[in-house]
């Protein structure tokens, strides 16, 4: 049978709602998440805008400063010629302090290096055979003399023979200046003209280079590598320095004496040689003044009249009115003139004592 209207109307009436389904819950949760994301995005955008505003102001200030600096540099470049290469950095206070600190350290290093070098050169000056209280060897002369000294000693050790003094001194003075050569000669108690024949072109060829007018004194320089007993064993005050007779050797031996020889105006014997005297860098040997031979005449004896109270026989000889007599002692009766043999004996004795003990 057919249904009634009432029944069909009941179908169109709203039915009571039941509990929400799981789909509704999912949709609501998604909406909440979308809203939270939107809020976060809005906050981030606001923060970014604020940062951009702040940074924009700073960047604008920096840009303005850079533009001003560029304008100043352009003005300076217009005034000054352009320099090639890297541009010089602006000197700040920190860079200036670092620069000063580096310079101070470099100066201290250089000062210490020079102090060490000078101390080493002073020690070397004490070792080389050249010493003077008034003069000081330069650095280059000290190194040259040390090189020559090492070479001479190595040659002696290699050959195993006692060297000739003249050749030894010539090796020491090779390449040195004249003042340094004079200092070495003064240390060895030699005259530079005796071992430098090239400085005397007028010297006769038959004469030896070493003359007896300047005999070799004992080698007073003490070296750490050589024995000490031979040095200073001879006393120069006991050695007579005999000059040759003027009439026989005056012209030939004039180059070897400090002053030219004159006829019978100097005594036959001179006192010992004093240490070399330095005058403007030139060393020369000077005889010490002797009270016995100060006069031009030799061995003159004066007797005052007050002390001659004796017999009449003596009074006739030593009278007060008469001139003082001259008592000359011949040289031949005292010592024969054997200059070269004496010089060679002294050299050989000293060298043998040094290198064979």
UniProtKB/Swiss-Prot annotation:
Induction: Up-regulated by fentanyl. Down-regulated by miR-190. Phosphorylated by MAPK1; phosphorylation regulates heterodimerization and DNA-binding activities. Phosphorylation on Ser-266 and Ser-274 increases transactivation on the insulin promoter in glucose-stimulated insulinoma cells. Phosphorylated. In islet cells, phosphorylated on Ser-274 upon glucose stimulation; which may be required for nuclear localization. In activated neurons, phosphorylated on Ser-336 by CaMK2; which promotes dendritic growth. Its main location: cytoplasm. Keywords: Activator, Cytoplasm, Developmental protein, Differentiation, DNA-binding, Neurogenesis, Nucleus, Phosphoprotein, Transcription, Transcription regulation. It comes from Rattus norvegicus. This is Neurogenic differentiation factor 1. It is found in: Cytoplasm; Nucleus. Residues 1-94 are annotated as: Disordered. Residues 81-93 have a biased composition (Basic residues). A motif (Nuclear localization signal) lies at residues 87-93. It comes from the Eukaryota.
